[in-house]
């Protein structure tokens, strides 16, 4: 019954709208998630911070605001990810534009950024670092690394590539939005369009979900591009291609870091060893799952 609780036509206060929106959203999700989503929608439409919403809880919505909120709320009730509705998503220290042509950046991927930054500490602070981000999407990984290296006043060169032209454009926009315009983004199917060159680091969050995985019919991934999610060979086809071809683009002593599914660590480690990488290690994400495997190229 709550699902059909429509918003009143009478002007609602911020507090009233939040209460009703949370009630409707709670039918399909936890009350805590419902509160987060309702607050995000209200802040987005009113252009107010959460603190301002709380401080002025009795402020009345305009008719136009109320109508727009209802449209956005309906989209969320139908399962569309909040990031696609708002067109933006926070990642690391960045505020990123997102669209349905790209994956939504997730907290799990911050584990990849953290691991790369940890390994970067092994390099001299005077060294000019070269980094390649494969399948860059929104540019999240490349830009997060750029933000940290800029703050550290390191000399670096970062290239992000993606097969989808719209993703490359979005990544460039995110670079401008976050004042990180020194990161280069280009269209390429993995390494195919890259000129011959060598990198200290190659990082990637490639497609790694198996084609028949039942999770593809659940949650946010229903709305995300399948090409960015799914890979053949039980989700390992693109990972294997990257591990094999990266050897041509890797400096001696350089590292390749790959995000993967929580049950794929053993298989990814085996692929690294098959193609003669050394010092293979797997890192846990914030939830304690095996999420990132990296290896060193020592040839």
Predicted regions and their residues:
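Conserved Class I SAM-dependent methyltransferase catalytic core
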Residues: 97, 233-296
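Conserved AdoMet
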Residues: 42-119
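Residue-level signal for inorganic ion chemistry
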Residues: 41, 79, 109, 141, ...
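Class I S-adenosylmethionine-dependent transferase superfamily signal
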Residues: 116, 145, 220, 242-246
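Conserved SAM/SAH cofactor-binding pocket of Class I
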Residues: 111-215
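Non-catalytic accessory regions of SAM-dependent methyltransferases
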Residues: 1-46, 51-54, 58-61
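Mobile active-site "lid"/loop adjacent to the S-adenosyl-L-methionine
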Residues: 208-238
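Active-site beta-alpha loop architecture of Rossmann-like, nucleotide-cofactor-dependent enzymes
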Residues: 83, 209, 263
